[in-house]
Amino acid sequence: MLLWLADLLGSHIRAFNVFNYTTLRAVMAALTALTISLLLGPWVIRKLTELKVGQAVRNDGPQTHLVKAGTPTMGGSLILLAITLTTLLWADLSNKYVWLLLAVMLGTGALGFYDDWRKVVYKDPKGVSAKFKMAWQSAIAIGAGVFLIATAKLPASTELIVPFFKTVAYPLGAVGFCVLTYFVIVGTSNAVNLTDGLDGLAALPTVLVSAGLAIFAYVAGHAVFSKYLGLPFIPGAHEVVVFCAAMCGACLGFLWFNAYPAQVFMGDVGALALGAALGTVAVIVRQEIVLFLMGGLFVMEALSVMIQVTSFKLTGKRVFRMAPLHHHFELKGWKETQVVVRFWIVTMMLVLIGLSTLKLR
């Protein structure tokens, strides 16, 4: 919106021209989303408490979690509101990627909201069925893939880019691209949701990975920088930086209330949406493999569940004391805050390794 004002009034009021700079709008987007989250957070928590949308706690989980029962959930709605308002304010609304990201995020957020609502209001511990959830996520992911193919301007927009190599890129074709997009978006969405099991555990890694992807988006959207660093040039990808910045600010603001001991939980409405958004950003900037690396924490959490389920079905034995992985370490004696901070440190390391692929090619 402000960029539109800059185009309209820039020739008359020179001060408006500063809004043409992506980096400035990204910084302002982060600050705006952070402010919205901090200001609206107490009100949202009060409303959720009044509605009695309290979190149910697993009886077979760590006993220290029993005190969390009744803590308001669905706080991710605050994150989505902050991201949406901020993006509409600071992003270029003529950019196709902006609308795609909002559509994917809000679409999966609606699924998460419905799932949370069934759990806490209708007292249905299972929420929506796995088939329904997968169908909804699949429709959104495949729709995003079809949209990106239909609007692609350059062959590089649909190639699989291999990090650490300047010239290694595999043409995927329409079907291959849609399949990859499906697995990245749906997989990341569910992986972040599985990670969101401890106070603050999912919020900061989302900030870190989003910030890392924002750097790739800035480079990919700049013809000179992308050529110098050996990345594909994706026209318009620079505007993704504003969305990522809004995500960082919104999640940091939410973390203020979600840090141990949490006053509110993200819920599926936040975790599913943020994961899908991260996956979509990676697909847009053609850095799916880098997302797999930087989001290694999410990958490990998801793999721990798959390994646990598969092992128990085949052998009747469990590999981990409990899945997802963060509960395994809790049952080994780690305090919740130790698990969270150590997982944050691991994510920082993985994001830095991912960023190193910008130059190590």
UniProtKB/Swiss-Prot annotation:
This protein's pathway: Cell wall biogenesis; peptidoglycan biosynthesis
Family assignment from sequence similarity: Belongs to the glycosyltransferase 4 family. MraY subfamily.
UniProt keyword annotations, A-Z: Cell cycle, Cell division, Cell inner membrane, Cell membrane, Cell shape, Cell wall biogenesis/degradation, Magnesium, Membrane, Metal-binding, Peptidoglycan synthesis, Transferase, Transmembrane, Transmembrane helix
Main location: membrane
Cellular component terms (Gene Ontology): plasma membrane
GO BP annotations listed: cell division; cell wall organization; peptidoglycan biosynthetic process; regulation of cell shape
Protein name per the record: Phospho-N-acetylmuramoyl-pentapeptide-transferase
MF GO annotations: metal ion binding; phospho-N-acetylmuramoyl-pentapeptide-transferase activity; UDP-N-acetylmuramoyl-L-alanyl-D-glutamyl-meso-2,6-diaminopimelyl-D-alanyl-D-alanine:undecaprenyl-phosphate transferase activity
Cofactor(s) listed: Mg(2+)
Membrane disposition: Multi-pass membrane protein
Annotated catalysed reactions: UDP-N-acetyl-alpha-D-muramoyl-L-alanyl-gamma-D-glutamyl-meso-2,6-diaminopimeloyl-D-alanyl-D-alanine + di-trans,octa-cis-undecaprenyl phosphate = di-trans,octa-cis-undecaprenyl diphospho-N-acetyl-alpha-D-muramoyl-L-alanyl-D-glutamyl-meso-2,6-diaminopimeloyl-D-alanyl-D-alanine + UMP
EC number(s) reported in the record: 2.7.8.13
InterPro entries found in the cross-reference section: Glycosyl_transferase_4 (IPR000715), PNAcMuramoyl-5peptid_Trfase (IPR003524), PNAcMuramoyl-5peptid_Trfase_CS (IPR018480)
Localization in the cell: Cell inner membrane
Ranges annotated as spanning the membrane: 25-45, 73-93, 97-117, 132-152, 167-187, 200-220, 240-260, 264-284, 289-309, 338-358
Keyword field contains Transmembrane helix: yes
Role, per record: Catalyzes the initial step of the lipid cycle reactions in the biosynthesis of the cell wall peptidoglycan: transfers peptidoglycan precursor phospho-MurNAc-pentapeptide from UDP-MurNAc-pentapeptide onto the lipid carrier undecaprenyl phosphate, yielding undecaprenyl-pyrophosphoryl-MurNAc-pentapeptide, known as lipid I.
